[in-house]
Regions:
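Surface-exposed, glycine-biased beta-strand/turn segments
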Residues: 1-60, 92, 142-147
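Residue-level detector of conserved, well-ordered beta-strand and adjacent loop positions
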Residues: 12, 35, 67, 77-80, ...
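Residue-level recognition of beta-strand microenvironments
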Residues: 14, 53-54, 82, 99-102
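Zn2+-dependent peptidoglycan hydrolase active-site motif and core
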Residues: 27-29, 44-83, 108-109
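Glycine-centered loop/turn positions within well-structured domains
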Residues: 32, 40, 74, 82, ...
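Short hydrophobic beta/alpha edge segments that flank linear recognition/processing sites
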Residues: 34, 63-64, 91-103
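Acidic, glycine-rich catalytic/binding loops that coordinate metals and/or anionic ligands
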Residues: 35, 85-94, 113-147
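Conserved "cap/hinge" positions at secondary-structure junctions
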Residues: 46, 54, 94, 99-100, ...
Length: 147
């Protein structure tokens, strides 16, 4: 996965340890929170299989989970709605939903998460990854076995 999942107006919470804005408990934040108006289109950052789409029953609210090649998975949380269905295939850039304020959320945003073999990695490293800086990702993200 690479590139931006949506147009956004800033990062409200980066990847890493933080004090949770609702519970007040210090814990790992496994993604990046991107501020956006409710209803902003959200796009797949890589082609893949829709593993889950709908109400998560957890802090994610309405959630889309995509499974990608090479052990990658992306999660898109707090959506106002999902427009994909489990079992379908999406291409990079396909519309998958709209940003929202569902689940444990303090305002409209997208929680964007990338996992490699089940382990969370910093999405910011992948959001700026492109053909011009292709080799940089292997040094920026040491938690992925690139060979």
């Amino acid at each position: 996965p690479n590139g931006l999942p949506m147009q956004y107006r800033g990062v409200t919470s980066p990847f890493g340890m933080r004090t949770h804005p609702i519970s007040g408990v210090m814990r790992m934040h496994h993604g990046i929170d991107l501020r956006a108006s409710e209803g902003t289109p959200v796009f797949a950052t890589a082609e893949g299989f829709v593993q889950f789409a709908g109400g998560s029953g957890s802090g994610y609210g309405i959630l889309v989970i995509l499974s990608h090649n090479y052990g990658f998975e992306t999660r898109y949380g707090h959506l106002s709605s999902a427009v994909v269905t489990p079992g379908s295939w999406v291409k990079k850039g396909d519309l998958i939903g709209y940003s929202g304020n569902t689940g444990y959320s303090t305002g409209p945003h997208l929680h964007y998460e990338i996992r490699f073999l089940g382990q969370s990695v910093d999405p910011a490293n992948f959001m700026g990854w492109n053909a011009q800086n292709f080799k940089n990702i292997s040094t920026l993200e040491p938690n992925v076995s690139w060979q």
